[in-house]
Amino acid sequence: MPIRYIDQLADLKDKKVFIRVDFNVPQDSKGNITEDTRITGALPTIRYAIEQGARVILASHLGRPKGEKNEKYSMVPAAKRLSELLGRKVKQASDCFGEEVTREIDAMKSGEVLMLENVRFYPGEEKNDPKFAQQLANGCQVYVNDAFAVSHRAHASVEAITRVIPTVVAGFLMRNEMTFFDKAMQNPVRPLVAILGGAKVSGKLEVLEKLMNKVDKVVIGGGMAFTFLKSMGYSVGASKVEDELLPTAKKIMDKARKKGIMFYLPVDCVVANAFEASATNFITTVQEIPEGWLALDIGPASATLFTETLRDAKTVIWNGPMGVFEMDAFARGTFAVAEAVASAFATTIIGGGDTDSAVRKAGVESKVSYISTGGGAFLELLEGKVLPGVKALDIKVKK
């Protein structure tokens, strides 16, 4: 669909430019930001708007305050961190709308930046309430969506607001996300390899269905692999399995076989006698998982097998860890795959969420082509869905 970007606008000087960013970043108990990738990702768009002389109004959510004001979820730490990164003052608004906020916006000078308070402090945000969108817009002349990670949500600051502000465009982060996704799924250099992990098959079912029409190889790891293994007749001990999806898992593998898609599952795993970091654990083949033990990581032979599948890959998409990587004892498989993806002579795209964290924890984030900022949004794109936040930018359907 045709989308305009912020650098295609002729003049931003002195205009009130509303930029929807995603500063939903992790913080420690004292409110210190522990990981600021989403803030740094929005810097190019914010800097561009500043350089063009716009009056920059930023909006984001943080956490799940359930439609009520809660200081724990204030945007103050994000504004402070952004100030440090930009090397200039970012003012924190008193709220996200209202008379005081209107005065704060009207008092802004060219090139100044104002951070609105958490848009989820009001139920109208998640209800996609047009009235709330009107209040948020506050006379802004240009709307910029640079929040890919929330673009699968039809929320007021993502969707309804685009019917209020006259000029609607996307930012540079959004352009990067869409460009790399198109490179991976619409026009991939082959072979195209998809690596899927995580706990549940149910969360990736639609993705798997879609991938069956796109990929050359599929690699399945993480907890979801054991639903597939059980569907093949393996005894998987106490490993978590979605029994209701066993027939579906079998159908997916049959479909892959008929289409000539290589389908890889773990051949060994690390099993433990409890879901605990200190649990007794050992490596075993998938045929010999003891009764009562649960698999919490792929084993070294599986890591080698999965690494081999990437040797001739030209495009790699990875979403979902290979094990419970948050626990050191069960992180080796995920880190081995992270190293393999980082070393591949291919366009490598990491699908946000836990996979993003795993790649950073493995220390290879600088060696992959692109790390998506969106977990759920990335998955919905893989499923072939049109994201509400992206559809709202389509210039063909704009008023």
From Swiss-Prot:
Is the Cell cycle keyword given for this protein? no
Q: How does it assemble?
A: Monomer.
Query: What reactions does this protein catalyze?
Result: (2R)-3-phosphoglycerate + ATP = (2R)-3-phospho-glyceroyl phosphate + ADP
Q: Give the location in the cell.
A: Cytoplasm
UniProt keywords (A-Z) are: ATP-binding, Cytoplasm, Glycolysis, Kinase, Nucleotide-binding, Transferase
Query: One biological process GO term for this chain?
Result: gluconeogenesis
| Name of this chain's protein | Phosphoglycerate kinase
Q: Which family does it belong to?
A: Belongs to the phosphoglycerate kinase family.
Give the source species. Answer: Pelobacter propionicus (strain DSM 2379 / NBRC 103807 / OttBd1)
